[in-house]
Amino acid sequence: SKYVASTPELDEIPAAAKLREDHCGGLDEQIGLCWGHSNQLNALEWHTCNEFNIAVRELVLLLAKREDLDEDDRLNADKVQAFYLAQGEMIEVYSDTLHFCPCEVTGSGFSCIVGLQRGTNLPIAPEQKVNKLWAANKWLLGHEANTGLIERGAFPGIYGENWKINPIIR
């Protein structure tokens, strides 16, 4: 899957200004896009701001609550719930909600418009990546089965089933 934090094409449309005014109190919100193929939990992240997702194609979000982290900041995957978003639906993901890359519903992939406080998810210097901070305003927990992400420095904070969404063949 791919993610672009901010795109001028989306940032400048009238709907983006309405989103900023209606849902962000006029704060500067970047409007980006996440798309591709994904069907497994693999990781969860959180931010200190709310996130808006608009399904361009139908998708499933795997979500949990930060309050479900144990005293070692680890999460049992049994706490994760799947939420379906139909094409065109918008959801506000609160800052205390663990989330990550959407999962595709069909084999044709997913596409999602993402609204976040400007600067969120931008790269940070390697020495800043401490205490699960992975990018600007992005804290990340990798599933312990996701060895590629763990080898790149993610905290192995999710254990149990690495949930998989099986796409529908249409």
Please report, for each region that a protein language model flagged, where it lies by residue.
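Active-site region of the double-stranded beta-helix
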Residues: 1-87, 100-170
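Aromatic-residue-lined binding/catalytic grooves and analogous aromatic/hydrophobic interfacial grooves
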Residues: 93
